Amino acid sequence: DRLLPAAIEAYEQSKLIGANAYFIKQDSLSSISDQAWKAAVTQAIENNTPEITFTNLAYSYASDDPVQVMMEAFTVVRDAAGQELPIGTFFSMAGEFGLVEQLDRTIVSKVLATMEQQKVSTPVTINLSMKSVASKDFRDWLRDRLQQFALPVELLAFSVTAYAAAKNQHTFGSFSLFVRELGATTLLKRYSSDVIPVEQIKGLHINYIRLARDLTTDIRQHNSKPDFLDIIQEVANLLEIKVLAESVSKEEDFDYVRGVGLFGISR
C-alpha cells in the first residue's frame, strides 16, 4: 500500500522535469505509513490548516500594458512536523480514505476566505476533484457557501483537468451548468485535443480552457501546433470560451501565442 504515494510522487515530479524523464526520490514518501497519511489529511480538514497562495498569474497582452486576467489558487499542506507534502499525493491519499470531498470543501472555503482577506479582484482558478464535481452533497454545500461569499461570484473559476473530465464529460458538463446558475465559471486545465476532441468542447459548457504546456512550447518546430492554436482560438470565439496559455517561457513562443490572440498568458 505504501508504494502508491511514492509512485504518484514520482509521476508528478517526472511531469515537471520533462515528458520522457523519470524521478527517484531518495527520501521517499513511501516511508510514511497509511495511518500517518490519514492523520495528516484529517488534521488538514478538522483544523483548517491548508495554506493558500496565488500562482500561475496570467495576463492579457492585447494592449501595450498587460492586464492580469487569471490566477490559480495553490494549496500547501504539511504533516505534523511541518514538512510540506506533495498536494497531488495528498489528494490521492485523501481519496483512498474517502475524505477527498471533505478536503475539497476545506480548501474551497480557505480559498474564498483568503480572497476576501486580500480583496482579490482578479478571477481565481480553484481546482476540484471529480468526486466533488459529481456529488450532489458538494453542490448543495457549494451553493450555500457561495451565498456567504463577500466578493463577486464571477471571480471564481472551478477547474478540473481535461484528463479527469474526459472520463465523465456528462457529469462535468452538468457541473458547469450548475456553477453557471450560481454566477461562477468553470475552467478545463491541461487541455489537448487528444484527451478531449475539439468538437466535444461545446457539451462541457465551460468558460475557460487552459492549454497543456506542450501545445505552446516550441510551436514553430511542429507544423501541427500553429494549426491547432488557430483552430482552438476560432472554436473558442464561436463558443465564447476564453483560452489561456500556461508557463510560456520562450520569447518566440510568447510572440506567437500573443499574435494568435489568446485571452491570457502566464510566463
Predicted regions mapped to residue ranges:
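Short acidic-capped amphipathic helix/loop micro-motif used as an active-site/signal-coupling element
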Residues: 79-84, 108-112, 190
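Catalytic core of bacterial c-di-GMP phosphodiesterases, primarily the EAL and HD-GYP domains
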Residues: 1, 97-172, 247
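Conserved, mostly hydrophobic/aromatic
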Residues: 66, 90, 107, 126, ...
